[in-house]
């Protein structure tokens, strides 16, 4: 961004340290609040598009009053003649889910935990008319202790100029299921921004089910991915998703070994079906069927 850099002071108080990420027309910075002597994250948006900047600030104001530990906390909001800014809690020590998934898929029960927490956080914003609409693995932050937080609720959609239609709950439900798919397979199943992940594989022109890519996929997660991403069905809201996959572990589930199947190569088409996933049991959550 022209005119700002490390050392720039915003509102006479917030010192920019280093850029953290760029989404659409806004940049997140690692910063320092010189008044309270604490590290913060700043979302800085140029006011060359005043309507967009106003939408970002409006979304941030509504998000600031949602008290939920799964959402990135907003401390301050402001603007001057050049910039609009949103001051958030420090997230510089967290890793994005995209970064974690660049190392490979996660254990299925860790996917359940992360997506359950994300869904519960998004559900808390629904009462304020807030929807994410731009959910990707880059929006999910994981602390060193495993706490899950969602960034960009409302503001990412405003930055993108997304239409605030009446399908926000369903779009976020699809986004959460896409996160589950990515967590299970390490690939992104939706069009648009992949957050650096590879595109999901297809089989005979259709999106491969997670169980066709990796082993050990619980039946309920496999079915939710199929219904939501391939059949335009599945959960209608993040809260609906959370209810369907509950309960989940309150603590992180660590990786033990790679779950990638050697039977399913990352092809884009072809009619040869992969080797069948592990057989089903009476408990649908134990493993997915072929």
Model-flagged regions — what are they?
Residues 77:
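Activation-segment/catalytic-loop signature of the eukaryotic protein kinase fold
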Residues 114-115:
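Activation segment signature within eukaryotic-like protein kinase domains
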Residues 122, 126-143, 152, 157:
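Catalytic-loop of the protein kinase fold
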């Amino acid at each position: 961004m022209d005119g700002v850099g490390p050392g720039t002071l915003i509102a006479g108080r917030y010192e920019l340290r280093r850029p953290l990420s760029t989404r659409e027309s806004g940049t997140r910075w690692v910063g320092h609040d010189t008044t309270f002597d604490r590290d913060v994250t700043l979302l800085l948006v140029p006011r060359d598009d005043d309507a967009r900047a106003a939408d970002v600030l409006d979304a941030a104001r509504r998000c600031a009053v949602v008290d939920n530990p799964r959402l990135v906390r907003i401390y301050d909001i402001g603007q001057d003649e050049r910039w609009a800014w949103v001051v958030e809690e420090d997230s510089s020590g967290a890793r994005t889910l995209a970064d974690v998934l660049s190392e490979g898929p996660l254990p299925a029960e860790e996917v359940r935990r992360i997506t359950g927490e994300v869904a519960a956080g998004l559900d808390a914003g629904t009462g304020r008319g807030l929807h994410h609409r731009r959910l990707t693995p880059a929006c999910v932050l994981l602390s060193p202790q495993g706490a899950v937080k969602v960034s960009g609720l409302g503001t990412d959609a405003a930055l993108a100029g997304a239409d605030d239609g009446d399908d926000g709950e369903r779009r976020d439900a699809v986004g959460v299921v896409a996160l589950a798919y990515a967590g299970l397979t390490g690939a992104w199943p939706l069009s648009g921004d992949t957050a650096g992940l590879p595109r999901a594989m297809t089989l005979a022109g259709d999106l491969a089910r997670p169980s066709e890519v990796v082993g050990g996929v619980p039946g309920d997660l496999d079915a939710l991915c199929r219904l939501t991403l391939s059949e335009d069905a599945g959960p209608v809201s993040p809260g609906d998703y959370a209810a369907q996959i509950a309960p989940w572990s309150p603590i992180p589930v660590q990786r033990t070994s790679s779950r990638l199947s050697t039977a399913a190569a990352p092809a884009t088409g072809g009619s040869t079906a992969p080797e069948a996933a592990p057989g089903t049991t009476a408990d649908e959550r134990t493993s997915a069927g072929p």
